[in-house]
């Protein structure tokens, strides 16, 4: 089905950002369909397992220092292109912190202090992780001298539970999936998150410390 979709779609090239489609495209190409250029874009700062099973035209990797690692895993050097991890343009410029905080407070209708330390908790688009434990420990350490924004992604159950469990804590602000991550990074002082390649790159560009 994928092969027919690609052939019938009139595409000029295929770009894979995950191992599974890269493996699928390898199988299609081994069956004789090598005329469509296929590129893999690595979104982790390491060579992931099983990437050496793929046979594509090119591999975009995060940095030239990783060329040796990928080459040792069997990826031909001539196919390695150290161009970095792509991120959205909105992460490549920053808003002044106080301006970002004002925009966030207005957008979400929060009564939130711009003078405290703001902590941002993000556990991925699916909202996995021990967010409540992070909230509890942060409050214990900071003694209410902070504002905590917890992004639950598409995990509605987590959003409901965090909202209910923290309803008496005015400094905790759970939200669901949002497109405001660039602005939230500008507004906050520290980011608690999983160490994904893309989110780490976004945070680096926004100059926000990661825990």
Regions found by a protein language model. Name each.
Residues 1-74, 79, 88:
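Active-site and donor-binding regions of nucleotide-sugar-utilizing enzymes
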Residues 19, 124, 196:
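Short glycine-/small-residue-rich Rossmann-like dinucleotide-binding loops
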Residues 39-44, 172-177, 193:
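Short gly/ser/thr-rich secondary-structure transition/capping motifs
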Residues 57-125, 154-155:
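A nucleotide-sugar donor-handling region in carbohydrate enzymes
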Residues 182, 200-206:
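Short alpha-helical segment that forms part of, or immediately flanks, the ligand-binding pocket
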Residues 186-196:
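Acidic donor-binding loop of glycosyltransferase active sites
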